[in-house]
């Protein structure tokens, strides 16, 4: 009789399934962004109409769409914009909105305050991108709304809707990180199609920046060729870049235009210039954006003939850059009554500056420890050890050999100080980087240590006085302080053809002198 076979061991249990994405997150309240990109079938219905709620819910979770879908949205929206006039005409009731600057989650709040785009007419005054870290989400969502509501939602061009600024600030980098350069180029083509101005109710001129000494009538705007990159000077540039003078309504000089020293291009226009333009064109007021406002809006001096504010600035990005601590506002105009609705900022996901990843963020800590080890290794050499092993080496001088090693120790010590400052003062470094246009600190700040960082200046003379005294433990606590620190970013960035720009500045000043005198205006 055969012996019974030994019992076989039971097979090991299958491994547990991997945890769902985000299950191991430290902050459980922050959901993991969707990894799935929306497809054409999910974004568009069978008739090719965008499902705006599906897109909105996905973007709010930091989700993305297929690149081809992003291109389709951008191109379809651009086709609608190309059919519009350079100066569109819109009717009340309407809600007018100012700068958005990539603050997508605040844009969602704006629509809560202003009303659903399905039954509310909207006019946006430009600057949808740059500075904020959700610019492409703003573009995709607004372009989908334009596709859905082409006759009730209107988009104007701001000074940031151009290649020059989006390359200099954050939008191009954001497009390349989240999508591709193809998406960025499609956005630039779409931006070239945006109208430059709107005539609201035959009463208000709506524009991003303001007036130009070369624009006297509304027909001058209508005749402009807008399908191009905005030039560094001229009427198109002025519509996007000009500002009211600081002493608007209380001018010491009656000259209408002076060189805009804050922007480094275009002009300041004053109260008499606005009143003359309004009277010549039978208008009530000019509504513009382009400047952050503590309350989200500003009403300027009233016209002596109509009793209505001659100029209104509206700004719709609350707590701009996460440091201004300002309110945002939208302007609702209905039945000849104008109402301002303010709102505060909404919570939003955090991005490190310039879309830095956590590994790059951790490098200062690693670098500090490595340099500490190198310093300790080199520092153990005694004078006796330095004297040994061939004094004839290094030009035959032991002193030269010792000096070479000491120089290495000093160099590594300098590196250690840089990494130490980066780690210990990371919050201040981030703040300074966020307030400089290139996202980079001034040369030598970190190597000089904490004291140098305290007295760091940004890249232009105009910002020096504002940022002097900025110390690492200090938090920006007022609107005016943030505006002063950020002033360098209000300038037109330097162009590759810098020589031509110098000529343009002289030409602009000469043009203002020839046509309007030489009024001097103090910049904000």
From Swiss-Prot:
Binds 1 Fe(3+) ion per subunit. It catalyses: O-phospho-L-seryl-[protein] + H2O = L-seryl-[protein] + phosphate; O-phospho-L-threonyl-[protein] + H2O = L-threonyl-[protein] + phosphate. Changing residue 365 to A: Moderate loss of calmodulin-mediated activation. Probably prevents recognition of substrates. Its main location: cytoplasm. Activated by Ca(2+)-bound calmodulin following an increase in intracellular Ca(2+). At low Ca(2+) concentrations, the catalytic subunit (also known as calcineurin A) is inactive and is bound to the regulatory subunit (also known as calcineurin B) in which only two high-affinity binding sites are occupied by Ca(2+). This is Serine/threonine-protein phosphatase 2B catalytic subunit beta isoform. Fe cation binds at residues 99, 101, 127. The modification N-acetylalanine is found at residue 2. Gene3D superfamilies: 3.60.21.10. PROSITE patterns: SER_THR_PHOSPHATASE. The keyword Mitochondrion does not apply. It is found in: Cytoplasm. GO terms for molecular function: calcium ion binding; calmodulin binding; calmodulin-dependent protein phosphatase activity; enzyme binding; protein dimerization activity; protein phosphatase 2B binding; protein serine/threonine phosphatase activity. The gene is PPP3CB.
């Amino acid at each position: 009789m055969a012996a019974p076979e030994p019992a076989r061991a039971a097979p090991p249990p299958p491994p547990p399934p991997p945890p769902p994405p985000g299950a191991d997150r430290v902050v459980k309240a922050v959901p993991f962004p969707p990894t799935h990109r929306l497809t054409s079938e999910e974004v568009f219905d069978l008739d090719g109409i965008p499902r705006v709620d599906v897109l909105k819910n996905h973007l709010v979770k930091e989700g993305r769409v297929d690149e081809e879908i992003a291109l389709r949205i951008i191109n379809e929206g651009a086709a609608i914009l190309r059919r519009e006039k350079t100066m569109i005409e819109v009717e009340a009731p309407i809600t007018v909105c100012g700068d958005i600057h990539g603050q997508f989650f605040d844009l969602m709040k704006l629509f809560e305050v202003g009303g659903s785009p399905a039954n509310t007419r909207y006019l946006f005054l430009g600057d949808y991108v740059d500075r904020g870290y959700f610019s492409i989400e703003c573009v995709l969502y607004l372009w989908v709304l334009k596709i859905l509501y082409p006759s009730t939602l209107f988009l104007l061009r701001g000074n940031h809707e151009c290649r020059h600024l989006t390359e200099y600030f954050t939008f191009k980098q954001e497009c390349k990180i989240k999508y591709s350069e193809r998406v960025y180029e499609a956005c630039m083509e779409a931006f070239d199609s945006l109208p430059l101005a709107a005539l609201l109710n035959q009463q208000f001129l709506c524009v991003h920046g303001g007036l130009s000494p070369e624009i006297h009538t509304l027909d001058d705007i209508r005749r402009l060729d807008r399908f191009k990159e905005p030039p560094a000077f001229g009427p198109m540039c002025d519509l996007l870049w000009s500002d009211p003078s600081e002493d608007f309504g209380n001018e010491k000089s009656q000259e209408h235009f002076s060189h805009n020293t804050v922007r480094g291009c275009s002009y300041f226009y004053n109260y008499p210039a606005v009143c003359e333009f309004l009277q010549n064109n039978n208008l009530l007021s000019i509504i513009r954006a382009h400047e952050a406002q503590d309350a989200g809006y500003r009403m300027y001096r009233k016209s002596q003939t109509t009793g209505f504010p001659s100029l209104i600035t509206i700004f719709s990005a609350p707590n701009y850059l996460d440091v201004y601590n300002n309110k945002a506002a939208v302007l609702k105009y209905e039945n000849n009554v104008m109402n301002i609705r303010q709102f505060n900022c909404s919570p939003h996901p955090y991005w490190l500056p310039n879309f830095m990843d956590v590994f790059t963020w951790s490098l200062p800590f690693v670098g500090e420890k490595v340099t500490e080890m190198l310093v300790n290794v080199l520092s153990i050499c005694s004078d006796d050890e330095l004297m040994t092993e061939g004094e004839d080496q290094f030009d035959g001088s032991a002193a030269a050999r010792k000096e070479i090693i000491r120089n290495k120790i000093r160099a590594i010590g300098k590196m250690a100080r840089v990494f130490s400052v980066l780690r210990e003062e990371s919050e201040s470094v981030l703040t300074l980087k966020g307030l400089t246009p290139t996202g980079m600190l001034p040369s030598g700040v970190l190597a000089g240590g904490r004291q140098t960082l305290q007295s760091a200046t940004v890249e232009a003379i105009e910002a020096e006085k504002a940022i002097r005294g900025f110390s690492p433990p200090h938090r920006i606590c007022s609107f005016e302080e943030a505006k002063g620190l950020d002033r360098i970013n209000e300038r037109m960035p330097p162009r590759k053809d810098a020589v031509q720009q110098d000529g343009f500045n002289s030409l602009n000043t000469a043009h203002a002198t020839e046509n309007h005198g030489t009024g001097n205006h103090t910049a904000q």
